Structure formats: C-alpha cells, structure tokens
A protein has these predicted regions:
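Paired acidic/hydrophobic, glycine-rich loop segments that form the ligand-binding mouth/hinge
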Residues: 95-99, 247, 264-269, 284
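Extracytoplasmic ligand-binding site segments that recognize negatively charged/polar headgroups
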Residues: 43-58, 93, 98-253
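Periplasmic-binding protein-like
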Residues: 123-126, 234-240, 278-302, 347, ...
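Conserved C-terminal helix/tail region of periplasmic/extracytoplasmic solute-binding proteins
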Residues: 256, 362-402
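Early extracytoplasmic/lumenal segment of secretory-pathway proteins
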Residues: 29-110
C-alpha cells in the first residue's frame, strides 16, 4: 500500500513559498559578542535520534548533563524531511535546527538563520578540516571576499541501501534492486518489497544512478540537472513507483515495514539500520554507484528567543563524548575526528564502520538551483538547471502516479 501525507507536502510547499519572499535580514546588531547567562530554555528542530536524553535508551543521553550545567532546559521538535525543517524555521519560535545541505543554503538565503560568532565556540578548532568551511554553511553575503559561518557541523554520513540479509545472502552491488524490476536472490520479484524516500531531494538518488549507468546523459552533479537529465531521472522514478510498497520519511514506519510488512530493500539512514540490526536480519551497503548523503549543521534562527542557551549548546555539540555517542547511536560520522579515537562505544573501528573513509564517495545534499556549476556538452548555460521548486512539484507528481 502506498501512503503519502499530502498535508505534509502542502506544509512543505507553503514553507517554500514563505521562504521565497522572506527578507534576508540579519539579527539587529549582528552576531552575539559575548555569551551571558542562559535564558533557561532552548528549542531545537532536529532529525530523529539527534537529541537524546535517555528516554529511547538510557545509555544515550547528551541532554541531561547539559541542562544541569547550564540551566537551559531542552525541547526538541523532530522533523522528518528538510522541507519540514524549512517550514518550521519559517514559522519561527525555535532557537536551533540541525539542517542538512538541502536546507541550510535555503535558510541562509532567506535570512532565517544568523551568522555565528566562532570566537564564542572554542571547540570549533577541533572540527574536521573538510567541514570547517563547507559551502553548505558558509556564504560571503557581504561580498568582502571572506565567507561568513552560519552554523556548526554536527554529524555526517551517507544514505545507505538497507537490505534483508535472509533475502540477500551477499550484499547488493547496485541500487538497481530498488530502481528497476528485478528478481531478487530468493527467486521473487522486488515489486512491492522495496521502499523509497519521499523527499524531493531523492531525485538526486535517481540522477546518481543514471550518472553511473547512462553516462551519455552527461550528468556531472546529481543536484545540477539540465531539463533532459531531470526528465530522465523522473522517468526512472516513475518506473520505481510501480515497485514501491511505501514512500517513507517516518523512521518508525520504515522500521516496522522491514519488521512486519515484507519490505526487504530501501534507501535508508544508518539510524534505522542500527535499530533493526538488534533483532532483525538487516544490514546496509554503499554500492558501485556511490550514494547521496548529508552533512548536518546546527544553525541558529535569526530571531532565536534564547541566544545564550543556543551558543552554550553549539559549544556542547562539539564535545567529543557527545560526538562519539551520537555517531554510535545514529550510525553517522562525528564532525570532530578526535571522537573516533576516544569513544568507548565506537571503539577503535567504529568510525571506519560508519563510513569515515567514504567521504569522497558521497554526493552530499545541497539545494538545487537554476544556476549550474558546469557547462555540460558546451550547450547548457549557467542558468539552465532545474530549480528546487520544480523538484518539489515533480516529486509530488511521481508519488501521485503522474
């Protein structure tokens, strides 16, 4: 049974519309210059599993000690997709958001997040050099030749191919098991036994697959697609639609589908893999085509109601204990490499298992825009790529059977 929340998509579209017309304003007076006494509260929009206080599992809690040390009581709002995060930040009332690259630049350009004063975050110098000045959270908005920072790296990782190890006695080598009808190793078709992510950014997964298998399309970046390349990705997704059991964005539902509904292969996050692998025959792999992925940044709302508590959390978020525990819990890679060396849960090989060496294989999420960063075949101009709002409307159409 295919299920889609059209109310969710309506919310996402409204968020996009509001973002398009929101003023690109900075907080009055610029970034905070000194961290003062906490305001007593802190609200964070986050991915599932990112803000843990020992409720899901008593062994994973990086909130309670922070609250005791700062007096800042943490409330978190779980968002299922980047579009939901943008919509919530547009609505306002939140302090921080753990934004992926397909949301972070939209938040910056819309003026919904503020520049961060790195002088107030002493642990920033411990961040992975590959992430410190990444383009998904640094922008030279004032044109002075120096990029401003709009967030603090949190965790990164890949969108993996999760599979049932009783069906696949050997790891799948290609994403074809979820994109094209095929007979699986157990002798049965994959039709009705796979899932796909329902976010518009998933079009990039189809483009990445075509980039490997159809090089004549000239795809160089799965987020920078000319009209013909974009249409080819949509055609592949329409084929996939006939195979999909469910389009997922709710991690709990996906866990249940692999446990009880006969789903045996899907794009997923390491978080679901870790939850399922405790008592289900589940594993994951990055295939020959590579994978899309996320590098998440904690960003601060322009009108954050609790800025002092927010800065205290930004510093706390880089604590090696938090970074390592979260990486073990979520199946991600810490933004602070030292966490890989000192965390008991991760052990000496935990970061390697979670994909520390896969950085170059990952096409990290970013917001598609009309401006291309290349000139494929010499005939696609600098503004000939399909912008994100068309990714949204076309993904809705694909899911709806059009």
């Amino acid at each position: 049974m295919r299920k889609v929340s059209y109310l969710f998509w309506l919310t996402a579209l409204l968020g996009l519309g509001l973002v398009a017309c929101a003023p690109a304003a900075a907080p009055e007076g610029g970034p905070l210059q000194e961290v003062g006494e906490g305001e007593g509260s802190l609200s964070i929009v986050a991915w599932a599993g990112y803000i843990e206080r020992g409720v899901t599992d008593p062994g994973f809690d990086w909130v309670t000690d922070f609250e005791a040390a700062t007096g800042c009581l943490v409330q978190d709002k779980v968002a299922a997709t980047s579009d939901e995060m943008v919509a919530l930040m547009t609505e306002g009332g939140f302090d921080l958001v753990t934004a992926s690259g397909d949301a972070s630049n939209r938040l910056i350009s819309a003026g919904l997040v503020q520049e961060i004063n790195l002088d107030l975050i002493p642990s920033y110098n411990t961040v992975d050099e590959r992430l410190k000045n990444a383009p998904w959270h640094t922008v030279d908005r004032d044109g002075d030749g120096t990029a401003e920072h709009y967030g603090v790296p949190y965790q990164w990782g890949s969108n993996v191919l999760m599979y049932n190890t009783e069906v696949f006695t050997e790891p799948p080598t290609s994403w074809n098991v979820v994109f094209e009808e095929t007979t699986l190793p157990d002798g049965q078709s994959n039709a009705g036994r796979i899932e796909a992510y329902d976010g518009p950014i998933y079009i990039a997964d189809a483009a990445l697959y075509l980039m490997y298998h159809n090089p004549e399309l000239g795809i160089q970046d799965p987020y920078e697609l000319t009209r013909d390349q974009f249409n080819a990705a949509l055609d592949l997704l329409r084929v996939q639609r006939g195979l999909v059991n469910r389009y997922w964005h709710d991690v709990v539902l996906q866990v249940d589908d692999f446990t009880n509904e006969g789903v045996v292969a899907s794009s997923s996050w390491p978080y679901q893999v870790n939850l399922l692998a405790v008592d289900q025959p589940v594993s994951s792999v990055i295939t020959v085509e590579g994978a899309t992925g996320w590098a998440d940044t904690t960003m601060m709302h322009t009108n954050a109601p609790h800025p002092n508590c927010a800065y205290k959390w930004l510093e706390h978020s880089l604590n090696t204990q938090l970074q390592g525990d979260l990486a073990y819990w979520f199946g991600s890679v810490p933004s602070v490499p030292a966490a890989c060396d000192t965390n008991e849960m991760l052990g000496p090989t935990g970061c390697d298992v979670n994909g520390l060496g896969n950085f170059e294989q990952i096409s990290f999420w970013k917001t598609p825009s009309a401006a291309c960063g290349f000139d494929p075949a010499g005939d696609a101009g600098p503004n000939d790529c399909v912008p994100y709002h068309e990714w949204v409307t076309n993904m809705i159409a694909v899911i709806g059977g059009r």
